[in-house]
Amino acid sequence: MPVRRGHVAPQNTFLGTIIRKFEGQNKKFIIANARVQNCAIIYCNDGFCEMTGFSRPDVMQKPCTCDFLHGPETKRHDIAQIAQALLGSEERKVEVTYYHKNGSTFICNTHIIPVKNQEGVAMMFIINFEYVTDNENAATPERVNPILPIKTVNRKFFGFKFPGLRVLTYRKQSLPQEDPDVVVIDSSKHSDDSVAMKHFKSPTKESCSPSEADDTKALIQPSKCSPLVNISGPLDHSSPKRQWDRLYPDMLQSSSQLSHSRSRESLCSIRRASSVHDIEGFGVHPKNIFRDRHASEDNGRNVKGPFNHIKSSLLGSTSDSNLNKYSTINKIPQLTLNFSEVKTEKKNSSPPSSDKTIIAPKVKDRTHNVTEKVTQVLSLGADVLPEYKLQTPRINKFTILHYSPFKAVWDWLILLLVIYTAIFTPYSAAFLLNDREEQKRRECGYSCSPLNVVDLIVDIMFIIDILINFRTTYVNQNEEVVSDPAKIAIHYFKGWFLIDMVAAIPFDLLIFGSGSDETTTLIGLLKTARLLRLVRVARKLDRYSEYGAAVLMLLMCIFALIAHWLACIWYAIGNVERPYLTDKIGWLDSLGQQIGKRYNDSDSSSGPSIKDKYVTALYFTFSSLTSVGFGNVSPNTNSEKIFSICVMLIGSLMYASIFGNVSAIIQRLYSGTARYHMQMLRVKEFIRFHQIPNPLRQRLEEYFQHAWTYTNGIDMNMVLKGFPECLQADICLHLNQTLLQNCKAFRGASKGCLRALAMKFKTTHAPPGDTLVHCGDVLTALYFLSRGSIEILKDDIVVAILGKNDIFGEMVHLYAKPGKSNADVRALTYCDLHKIQREDLLEVLDMYPEFSDHFLTNLELTFNLRHESAKADLLRSQSMNDSEGDNCKLRRRKLSFESEGEKENSTNDPEDSADTIRHYQSSKRHFEEKKSRSSSFISSIDDEQKPLFSGIVDSSPGIGKASGLDFEETVPTSGRMHIDKRSHSCKDITDMRSWERENAHPQPEDSSPSALQRAAWGISETESDLTYGEVEQRLDLLQEQLNRLESQMTTDIQTILQLLQKQTTVVPPAYSMVTAGSEYQRPIIQLMRTSQPEASIKTDRSFSPSSQCPEFLDLEKSKLKSKESLSSGVHLNTASEDNLTSLLKQDSDLSLELHLRQRKTYVHPIRHPSLPDSSLSTVGIVGLHRHVSDPGLPGK
């Protein structure tokens, strides 16, 4: 029965603990995340903001190297040390000059403390900043006694009492203060000024380790860092300085000239890495600086890079145990090593040195937990800084969790003992404690009465319970589990300790031995203090207050317990008052007279038995609590009457509260039934008001009854909306978990994509016989069947039966608009379906394009409900309403499929592919029939609009080889063919019929009928693997072009009619020279590659009436005939076409020059302004210009 609250689930309280502890100590610190790029700052306290002048928004997400605090006086050496500490995940303290926001400088000690998880990987950095006062700056140590024991130095978070200890502490940050194995370098000379190292041979830029330079540079950008790498330790166990001497032999001669003083810059401790992970940080590739620096850790067994010569024993130890014992930092202020030139050879001779070097002979192997280091440095106590990980509450050895199974069992046991105490303590105090019982107990102790033994055991159990409460965790105000014994004791003392202690005191044992009446009465009263334990029962049972049945039982038990207590009090009043009554009118005397057991003063055992007394007292209290009493047991004395008044008053309150709650509880139990009848009444009223016929009425009632049984009248969507969106996504992900795991189309989706899909899914429950989709309904959703079976009927004929994990609907990505169902879908059994709306699915696919191709490739419909004629309906709707084209394009998606996916789709959906082939074959036959019976130009134009949907001829040989191209990719390619708009002239009109006849003959070049038909129909061998959706898209765009072509042709015909009607002067028309015979043996109508503005060409030759031939009289007659035929709705006759053809042959030599120009420039001619009716013809011919993207009619 424990309350499982607080720190039950594992959680990370690291940040909260750090912030809460540090804020009260006036610290100035930041916390950086070591797992993100540049170790970004994730928290800075108010002290840091006050110290630097920057606000928290200015500091957050900045690199923890604090580049914004750097300035001209900030030394690169200090910056490099901070960067090296961050790269190596090592603890270090550096004295740096920083700049306030207002530009002023300040000096502070920067303490970098890595916080690692249980695997030793640095998760965070705590960087503390502490001002350096002038006294600390001036206190430069003159000499440090190497033998001086340091045992009484109390460190308080970076502060030290003696300046002389600062240098020593810089060298051994994490060593215990009592550690005698300390390396101290005693220099012979000390000065306050640094001496230039004239003879010091600095490593060149080429000899510096590139990885180290890059690593350091990456952390101190944008400032440039020096390629020198400063370390404070050797690289080998046997001879720590031999590598240094071998690399720079001239350093031995120049060492005496170096300054041995510790300036502010050299005061910094240049500590080595504390583990293998830190050493690996030196050789990290620059590109991987901010990755997991410890992802390839192997505990020192395999270290790559320039540190291969280091022994595993050194790598496995810490910097405090093995590395500091070789420290020679006091010998040279700045040691610069070239890691790339370190060799594994060892020299036998040690380097000469004039200084006195004391190195401890033996160093212990120690492994300091980072948590302990941080705790020691920050002085926060033992359990202040937990490891950065998901962790269960830390408890001591003998501490009991308040939600543990043992505590739950113990609480139930104590609850039973409390109930026993509540019942037997008043009974024992009222009925059993008398002179005779006291005399028996003095003679034989507790062995005479078993009840006394039980009371003693209960007292012992309650004392043990008090001890357990001192070791039981509790939940504080921050919802955290407190396991500290001291805090638990304080919390228990402030709470229930006093009540539990009073209830557990065995008062009868404390005053055992005295046999007076006052003692007996006092023991009875003190034993009633055990009833205080009922308060614990109340706090334990509080969690069950929301259950109606539990509350009802609890109220009844309370009512009976109060009646029991009042019965004991009623008997105690009569028993105490009876010896002092002279008339014997008490209720006990009346009871003795009624049952024939009168009291005899000389016999103490006379009178009614204890059983008779208790039952009668309990009867009186129950009758008084529930009513005014029957009267057979009545109060006679004043004391009894006063008590009866109190019982009646308590009874009225108890009756009102208990039975009022009982009525509310009963009403709550039947609330579901009441809601059902209310909703059913609404359904029946709806049926009556709308006069719904009986079959449909029966279906409504049956569905309502089944739905109520299934959901108990609860609207699941309303319940789901009551939770935050994050919980809604998790709930939806759980509800659709089986579908998302079993369906092949959803495999491989990211977690975010699955959550988005789960939010869009709706669960539908259908009873048997319910029709889910009717024939002709718009398919607005995709259905996934998760339970049950359904049947699909066409004309009441079952065409398919679907079961679990089947999918039906339509391929939503292939169509711009939803289609119509071609069958009925009816449930055979109770079915659970997951459906997702078409728009919702497409929206998710748009948001996750990487998942879109996978989903659409692997989506396999068990049954496609889309009607076969839906494609034609879609094309017709688009052609009838061009204004909706943009809306349709919003739903068009460029879906690139691999060849395997296309083949899979074609094999998975044979019905669609067969329908497509049949549609192409029927359209092709229709095209051939139309071509064969082209009786007139107008009818041929109307007939050829259908086959021209794929008249985009690919003129380049390479384009046809590409497969799987979208139509958007084909349009620019086909644009190489230019539209030669020569329909302005009469010759172009008359050549339409001849083009049809001539086009049927094979051409010598590339215009064979088979090739042209394949190119025109778009069903060539190389493009046979196009998907149905891509063909649909091409059809849509081509239909739009045909519409524009039809309107343009109508305009051209109207303009021609106007020209024929208005032309009164016999003049030779400005014919296009490109209609000459021999030069045009290839298609002359081409698609323009680009939509260039059309320019008019002015001819140098102007025609005069004297140049006209006699044949123009025939031409005029033919024109008049054409005018009459066209105005009357009859097509152009063939006679006019023959006359025009012969006339053009005669006039070809006159327009040869213009023809050559037009061939070169591909510019369409207009009527020369010098000709008669030039203004009218120009206006009319301008209207003949087509859009450059319109497909032209192919001709010779």
Swiss-Prot record:
Residues 745-845 are annotated as: cNMP-binding domain. Pfam families: cNMP_binding (PF00027), Ion_trans (PF00520), PAS_9 (PF13426). Residues 41-70 form the PAS domain. GO terms for cellular component: monoatomic ion channel complex; plasma membrane. Residues 194-217, 876-915 are annotated as: Disordered. Heme inhibits voltage-gated inwardly rectifying potassium channel activity. It is a multi-pass membrane protein. Glycans are attached at residue 600. Keywords: Cell membrane, Coiled coil, Glycoprotein, Ion channel, Ion transport, Membrane, Phosphoprotein, Potassium, Potassium channel, Potassium transport, Transmembrane, Transmembrane helix, Transport, Voltage-gated channel. Residues 1028-1055 form a coiled coil. GO terms for molecular function: heme binding; inward rectifier potassium channel activity. Expressed in prolactin-secreting adenomas. The chain crosses the membrane at residues 413-433, 450-470, 495-515, 522-542, 550-570, 642-662. The keyword Cell membrane applies. It catalyses: K(+)(in) = K(+)(out). A motif (Selectivity filter) lies at residues 627-632. The modification Phosphoserine is found at residues 174, 238, 319, 896, 899. It is found in: Cell membrane. GO terms for biological process: potassium ion transmembrane transport; potassium ion transport; regulation of membrane potential. Pore-forming (alpha) subunit of voltage-gated inwardly rectifying potassium channel. Exhibits faster activation and deactivation kinetics and slow inactivation at membrane potentials positive to 240 mV, resulting in the weakest inward rectification. This is Voltage-gated inwardly rectifying potassium channel KCNH7. The lineage of its organism: Eukaryota, Metazoa, Chordata, Craniata, Vertebrata. The gene is KCNH7.
